[in-house]
């Protein structure tokens, strides 16, 4: 459960990300593909090279979905329902991959905002990404 302090940290972080969401999303995807090569299996039709337009576009989708989630912290299941359906029923993404991408997102955010990435912010973002992952995998059951 996200506390009021967590929610404040999440909203403040998303405000700081601003127009860099797509860039950070793409960087996090690239990190995921490099560190966890099995994640590439879901993107056989993508050019996965550094700076690929397809990775950038998907990174923007990830960032946009997280921005929606950050704006609806009190009702993540409703905010992410369509995305949950897509990943569970059509794409059939292995749930572990959400955790891997979440880790790479945290690394990316820490790399770009080291001063703001305090232990409290880290914990709040980790809880947020875990909550998002839980919602995205909730329809697998």
Curated annotation (Swiss-Prot):
UniProt keyword annotation of Heme present: yes
Phosphotyrosine: residues carrying this PTM: 24
Top-rank taxon, per record: Eukaryota
Binding site for heme b: 87
Keywords for the protein's UniProt record, in alphabetical order: Acetylation, Heme, Iron, Metal-binding, Oxygen transport, Phosphoprotein, Transport
Gene Ontology cellular component list: blood microparticle; haptoglobin-hemoglobin complex; hemoglobin complex
Endpoints of the signal sequence: none
Modification N6-succinyllysine occurs at: 7, 11, 16, 40
PROSITE patterns referenced in this protein's UniProt entry, alphabetically: GLOBIN
Modified residues (N6-acetyllysine): 16
Gene Ontology MF terms in the entry: haptoglobin binding; heme binding; iron ion binding; organic acid binding; oxygen binding; oxygen carrier activity; peroxidase activity
Example GO BP: hydrogen peroxide catabolic process
Tissues in which the protein is found: Red blood cells.
Binding site for O2: 58
Keyword Heme: yes
Residues that bear Phosphoserine: 3, 49, 102, 124, 131, 138
Function of the protein: Involved in oxygen transport from the lung to the various peripheral tissues.
UniProt family annotation: Belongs to the globin family.
Full protein name: Hemoglobin subunit alpha
Species this protein is from: Proteles cristata
